[in-house]
Amino acid sequence: MRTLGTCLVTLAGLLLTAAGETFSGGCLFDEPYSTCGYSQADEDDFNWEQVNTLTKPTSDPWMPSGSFMLVNTSGKPEGQRAHLLLPQLKENDTHCIDFHYFVSSKSNAAPGLLNVYVKVNNGPLGNPIWNISGDPTRTWHRAELAISTFWPNFYQVIFEVVTSGHQGYLAIDEVKVLGHPCTRTPHFLRIQNVEVNAGQFATFQCSAIGRTVAGDRLWLQGIDVRDAPLKEIKVTSSRRFIASFNVVNTTKRDAGKYRCMICTEGGVGISNYAELVVKEPPVPIAPPQLASVGATYLWIQLNANSINGDGPIVAREVEYCTASGSWNDRQPVDSTSYKIGHLDPDTEYEISVLLTRPGEGGTGSPGPALRTRTKCADPMRGPRKLEVVEVKSRQITIRWEPFGYNVTRCHSYNLTVHYGYQVGGQEQVREEVSWDTDNSHPQHTITNLSPYTNVSVKLILMNPEGRKESQELTVQTDEDLPGAVPTESIQGSAFEEKIFLQWREPTQTYGVITLYEITYKAVSSFDPEIDLSNQSGRVSKLGNETHFLFFGLYPGTTYSFTIRASTAKGFGPPATNQFTTKISAPSMPAYEFETPLNQTDNTVTVMLKPAQSRGAPVSVYQIVVEEERPRRTKKTTEILKCYPVPIHFQNASILNSQYYFAAEFPADSLQAAQPFTIGDNKTYNGYWNTPLLPHKSYRIYYQAASRANGETKIDCVRVATKGAVTPKPVPEPEKQTDHTVKIAGVIAGILLFVIIFLGVVLVMKKRKLAKKRKETMSSTRQEMTVMVNSMDKSYAEQGTNCDEAFSFMGTHNLNGRSVSSPSSFTMKTNTLSTSVPNSYYPDETHTMASDTSSLAQPHTYKKREAADVPYQTGQLHPAIRVADLLQHITQMKCAEGYGFKEEYESFFEGQSAPWDSAKKDENRMKNRYGNIIAYDHSRVRLQMLEGDNNSDYINGNYIDGYHRPNHYIATQGPMQETIYDFWRMVWHENTASIIMVTNLVEVGRVKCCKYWPDDTEIYKDIKVTLIDTELLAEYVIRTFAVEKRGIHEIREIRQFHFTGWPDHGVPYHATGLLGFVRQVKSKSPPNAGPLVVHCSAGAGRTGCFIVIDIMLDMAEREGVVDIYNCVRELRSRRVNMVQTEEQYVFIHDAILEACLCGDTSIPASQVRSLYYDMNKLDPQTNSSQIKEEFRTLNMVTPTLRVEDCSIALLPRNHEKNRCMDILPPDRCLPFLITIDGESSNYINAALMDSYKQPSAFIVTQHPLPNTVKDFWRLVLDYHCTSVVMLNDVDPAQLCPQYWPENGVHRHGPIQVEFVSADLEEDIISRIFRIYNASRPQDGHRMVQQFQFLGWPMYRDTPVSKRSFLKLIRQVDKWQEEYNGGEGRTVVHCLNGGGRSGTFCAISIVCEMLRHQRTVDVFHAVKTLRNNKPNMVDLLDQYKFCYEVALEYLNSG
């Protein structure tokens, strides 16, 4: 409408009625408008009004005068409509409609829009042909309509008013239908219908009578289709012109009715409607059909009866081309079928049909293509010139003349090598397909043949249409060596001093076996004192003998037997197996006369002599006391000569045992003969040597036991006999009086002294006796129960002796690798001599710390009573030298008087300073716990918010660091109500590091609210955006971008979230937390604000972190630590920092581990040079740094106690353990979930962390025959996607093949299905599909097994670093591709020890290099050993980890 409005101009001045003849349809509105045949629409919002001011004057100056049709827009909302309909006109002669209109407004704003429509033949209304919407003029104007519809069409003119919401008037008057042409507007002649094919231009020619001037607008108007612009105007005379319009790129949507329009200064001219018909070129709906096919032709049916588009069809064509070619050919077709000839055999073609209708552009696009292939043709001939190139014992190589497509006449063909030979009197026929046909010198090698065999060979060229054969050749394979004797057939029956060896002849003899050669050699013995140098030899046996008895061997010795078979060509490969002779019982010394050295009523003293070992060292000596009872026969005595089952004296009566163990000694404590007293009332290795009872008779036995390889052999000898003491007769009273009087005085004096002495001793020994009673009760429980509870342990419990005083010096300083110094200290327990790191002591005046340390200064707010806190100054708790730390911790843990418990209890508990702000009612809701709140003197004060006088409070306190005031803020874990305050504090304090030492939820309780976003979050005026997350096994590092409204600054803040703290207690080991502390130190900017540290309450774990961080700095700078005074200082700043004794002890253990181990990480750029230096041998110590590092690792590796492995030691689980000395601890067991009958949920396996993922590895032993089903339950239950196998299948060592080579193996409900296998260098990879048949809804899992062949059993390390690194990378790639790195990896070797640990350690080191560009082999192995002490158990394996890291760096 706006376009039409702009094309119209005001027709000012045309106030006179045009002269000439008029037709019906006009109206002057002097009479009612209905008399003129005018009407109004029923659906209008309001009606036009007929006004006559002559008969009904008005005083409204805005209303025109006269008689007219009026719309008063006052009070009418915007958008309301009213229509005035003229009568239908059927004027075929030239005529003109003339009318006047009036527009006025009281606000100078248009009162509405006046439109004129022309509706033809009661058709759609269409768009307005004329409108006026300009500013009101308050004068009458004239307009004319030149309408050309032509007979038999009729039309109707409609006036429409659309209100604008403004007050005013719109009126029309003097509507006339004149019988002559319009004076200012051209008339169109009749326009004709147009038909085109889709995609072509449709041109409409509109001839008009009249003049056109510049400024007139012409266009082609359609109904429900697009308008077309003017193409050109051609003036044919002074009063005639032709206007052309193009509808471009026609489609079916353009078909419809169009009319010509011209807008002039005086009015509008319109033509009749013409139809645009758009025809769609025909396209077949279906592809042509294949009637028949040959090698060189295709016969098709056009199949073009059904089409898309319009007919009629005037022509047909077939277009075809090769599917891979760029050319095509088009052939006209005059029938419904067509044969395409002269085609190539076995070639794919695409064939389409094209149809044409009349008119330009009438040819449609090609129809759907038929894609088909010609048949192959019979090969021209068979292969020629077949000849033998090379003959070997197991293979022959043949060659033939090359050929190509012109011979095969087919792209799909097989060249098959057909050969036959006899095996065992039976004809064997084989076929192999050769794919080397395109080689310029084609040849094929037939392998896996038997030696000395005639083989007939021919080639067969085959395609789907036929086959051609070559001539046949016959050739004989060469002679060969025999195969190996089957390893599983080498069986040995072992005795103490002989082995009976049996074997079978090789499965593949390849001739007559003439000889067997057996080489034997002693490789190891359980007894290190045995000389094995003479225990070797070689034996030859004739080919028909397959057994031999070896005698004169040593007990307890492992012998290696290697057998080779020989034919006339020589010896075949060896087969080796090992067998171990049984150990013998120790040889006890002779005791010809059972005469004791001394004897009292309660004791017997005998001389104990060392026993002679036989095959295994003596493990232990034991003293057994047997009570002589009535009715014991000699036979029974002989049967019970030796005593394999130890029984404590306390349990002997409970068990009704006739004997008990009085003492037990380690073998090294009895190197020479020495006396021993039975009944001395002391305890030896847990056995109470109780005094003998005088009225009983005893036999004293001395026995020695040797233990090795699961065997225990005992020998014993009776060393003494004690008879019962006969009671002396009682003397007569009168003879006794003098004697009694004489001794009474002596006895009274002695008794007085004893009473005083006992009073003192009882007080001193009270706790010691209590401890002994506890140990005795514990020992009894261990004998009477199967399972014991797991207990936490520390370094002192793991490897120290509380009765010995010693000191240590670590081979690693706090900053890095080992250093050397002339001074050294000796550890008595293992004679380890190491050096003092000079960097501990930068200044001689600081070698010993005192209460001058800032950490030890008293605080103003401390309120203590002397009676409650006996130690108030640093003088009673001086700093401890790092060199003395191990001794100090050992003494504190083993102390019978003042130990960690007493030291921790000396700390002031509870409030020690005012906390009035925290106690305000307005601040109570800001505290997570009512008893852990902020002291006033050290609390963090936030900037006050407007209108809130308490908005400066947050539950957090400043804590001083090492020579850095207010270096930390200890705070609680944010609550939902305090998240905004928390970020306010972080921003205000310019904090760059947040340390979080809790999980959000622990044991079902919320410990901290999640105060950070996963993407972006706005906390009032602070915007926090997560930009990076680094997930590691025991902690997460998140990086945020933080902005504050109104401040043009973006700060980067890191959150260090330690996730490895258990729900109860403290971490089992400090290794992970120490690595976490080092990360915080390395990534915290030195000039930033305080470190914000929080757990849940902000006291216990928070205190642990801060104390450890401060003490590491102190140890590095001063060579001392002052843990006690540091904790005391922290508690003066915030209540109850370090909340439990357990945490206090853990801090000591963590600092000790840090001092022992140091920071062993190496930047990637320095690995090569440092590793070279680490391997240099020190001529003075004859050792190297890497050896010392490995020794340190062994020293700090915890030893598993019996109670740690209680589940593995249950009797029902014994048969599931390959080695009883390599057991998984209870805390890292993966309990089996899948139910399998009565089977237990135990498997000998342990969960291990990788660098980035907790419990990423499961380390286990090679499945035993009875645990294969448990192994697959483990794989399924723990979502394992990779299995790494680092040992060989060896049934002799109970290492069966546990997987299927094809088909499906069923292990209870678990089904393992073989999918595929591949061999690449030293790695066999097999893919299996496993699923639980009892739970089909769970679906299946794909598991890839990687069997590594490059680690022979006789080597401590793999043969190749490159191939082992390739194994690591293949496992990583499969893990990432199959399960996004989320699945676990099962790693197993023979016993789940050194080899498995080496794989896990190297995998961790490679992850370190990828993500941190550092190498820390020590930390990687230490982390693994925290769960299993036998991980990476050899120095060579430890070195190999470094060497693979170098290989990783070299490979890029």
Curated annotation (Swiss-Prot):
Give a single Pfam family match.
Answer: fn3
Residues bearing Phosphoserine? 821
For whether the record's keyword set contains tRNA-binding, the answer is: no
Q: Does the keyword Thylakoid apply?
A: no
MAM domain mapped to chain residues: 22-184
Q: Which UniProt keywords apply?
A: Cell adhesion, Cell membrane, Disulfide bond, Glycoprotein, Hydrolase, Immunoglobulin domain, Membrane, Phosphoprotein, Protein phosphatase, Receptor, Repeat, Signal, Transmembrane, Transmembrane helix
GO MF terms listed in the record are: cadherin binding; transmembrane receptor protein tyrosine phosphatase activity
Question: Where, by residue number, is the active site?
Answer: 1095, 1389
Q: Where in the cell is it found?
A: Cell membrane
**Which positions fall inside the Tyrosine-protein phosphatase domain?**
900-1154, 1186-1448
Signal peptide positions on this chain: 1-20
Q: Which SUPFAM superfamilies does this UniProt record tie to the protein?
A: (Phosphotyrosine protein) phosphatases II, Concanavalin A-like lectins/glucanases, Fibronectin type III, Immunoglobulin
**Quaternary structure and interacting proteins, as annotated:** Homodimer.
Task: Note the PANTHER family from the entry.
Answer: PROTEIN TYROSINE PHOSPHATASE, RECEPTOR TYPE, M (PTHR24051:SF11), SUSHI DOMAIN-CONTAINING PROTEIN 1 (PTHR24051)
Q: What class of enzyme is it?
A: hydrolase
Q: Which residues lie on this side of the membrane: Extracellular?
A: 21-742
Q: Which residues are glycosylated?
A: 72, 92, 131, 249, 406, 414, 454, 534, 544, 598, 651, 681
- Tell me which residues make up the Ig-like C2-type domain: 186-277
| Full protein name | Receptor-type tyrosine-protein phosphatase mu
